[in-house]
Amino acid sequence: AGHVAMIAGPDLVTSLVEPDEFLAYVSGDLGRRFVAGDADLAARLAAMDRRPDPDGRFRVTEFFCRDDTWQATVQRLVGESDAVLMDLRSFSAANQGCVYELGRLLDTIDLARVVLVIDGTTDRGFLEATLTRLWAQLAPDSPNRQAAAPAARFCEVSGPTAAESRALVGHLIAA
C-alpha cells in the first residue's frame, strides 16, 4: 500500500468534477490546479503527501496537465512509482493517445509492475502490436531488456462490480 498519483488532462477535469475542484472552478482558481512547468512539477512532487491518513488510507494526488506538461509529468511519476495502473479502455488506432506513456513504461519500469486495464472497447490486436513495436525500440537501459518479449499484466473489466474491483486490487498487489 502507498500513496497514489494520478495524471489527468483537461478532459477528465471537466468530466469528473470533485467538490474541491468545483469550488476551485467557482472561485476562478482551477487554473492553478494544472502543472505549470518543470519547477512547478518538482514543487508538487516534493509536497506530495506520502503518509497514510489516521484511518490508514492513502490520498490520491492529482496532477492535472496540459499539452506542454504531461510528458514530463509522466516521466517523473513513472520513475518514482512502485507500480503503475494504466487505463487503456477505448485504446485503438483511432484513439491511441497513450502510446507515449506505454513507451515510457517499457523504458522505465519493469513491466511486471504494470497493470493495464482493458475492456470490450480496447482494440487488443492494436494494443499488442503497439507493445511489440515499442518493445523493439526499448531504451538501452530499460529494466525490461532482460525479457525476451513483453509480458504485460492485463486486467479486463466490463463494469463497476465488486468482483472486478477485487481482481484489479489483486493485480496491483501482485505488481
Where are these regions (language model features)?
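C-terminal interaction surface of TIR/SEFIR-family domains
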Residues: 124-175
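N-terminal targeting/trafficking signals and adjacent low-complexity tails
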Residues: 1-20, 25, 75, 126-127, ...
